[in-house]
Amino acid sequence: MAAAAMALSSPSFAGQAVKLSPSASENSGNGRITMRKAVAKSAPSSSPWXXXXXXXXXXXXXXXXXXXXXXXXXXXXXXXXXXXXXXXXXXXXXXXXXXXXXXXXXXXXXXXXXXXXXXXXXXXXXXXXXXXXXXXXXXXXXXXXXXXXSLVHAQSILAIWACQVVLMGAVEGYRIAGGPLGEVVDPLYPGGSFDPLGLAEDPEAFAELKVKEIKNGRLAMFSMFGFFVQAIVTGKGPLENLADHLADPVNNNAWAFATNFVPGK
């Protein structure tokens, strides 16, 4: 019985010796251990519109995309009707202008909506809506933004304009030519002190944010244009028009104003 138990527990029970553990000489080979820092990579977007191989919306219209076309700036025959992206140099300049103007329009649309939202939330702001601001700004002592003369109260719109020119000129000069904020690597996306939130550190997320910035900027430019047209026609800001439309969608819409203009009246 004891012999049977020994035979069962022996590694050479099946007639072939089983190697239980590697020998010391095998352990001490000349292997090398490398350690690397595991950085959590942000997962690329699952959205079909902002990834690198984005679906082109005009895919049915033009089968062949031009060589200069990326996902963000489709330069197919249908997408660039004015042939603005025909030359590569002009396309690069137009892309730079699109990104810069898109960032400005995104801020402007946010400000136009925010002022109307503040007025709707019963905050007593003396400044008018975005539509009527130009008329009020030229009048003397009208640029009291928070309706309290002690906070921000500019007597002259020209003084505000001069300060804006100086400040924006300095920032743009640093962005193009470098300066105390650091050297310029890419003037369109400067990074460094211009990127205080560190949004551009991960290259994949940065590439996706570039596409989102251009797409949302185009929407913001178009919606800002729509805000101006609405204000010219109705004399109200965007949020007031939206509230009127939601209150009575049948009567308060663009068609009611479009049929309102009778020549000679």
From Swiss-Prot:
It is found in: Plastid, Chloroplast thylakoid membrane. Chlorophyll a 1 binds at R218. Chlorophyll a 5 binds at K212, Q230. Binds at least 14 chlorophylls (8 Chl-a and 6 Chl-b) and carotenoids such as lutein and neoxanthin. This is Chlorophyll a-b binding protein 1A, chloroplastic. Chlorophyll b 3 binds at S156, E172. Chlorophyll a 4 binds at N216. The gene is CAB1A. Chlorophyll b 2 binds at V152, L181. Signal peptide: none annotated. Keywords: Chlorophyll, Chloroplast, Chromophore, Magnesium, Membrane, Metal-binding, Phosphoprotein, Photosynthesis, Photosystem I, Photosystem II, Plastid, Thylakoid, Transit peptide, Transmembrane, Transmembrane helix. Chlorophyll b 4 binds at Q164, R175. It comes from Solanum lycopersicum. The LHC complex consists of chlorophyll a-b binding proteins. GO terms for biological process: photosynthesis, light harvesting in photosystem I; response to light stimulus. Photoregulated by reversible phosphorylation of its threonine residues.
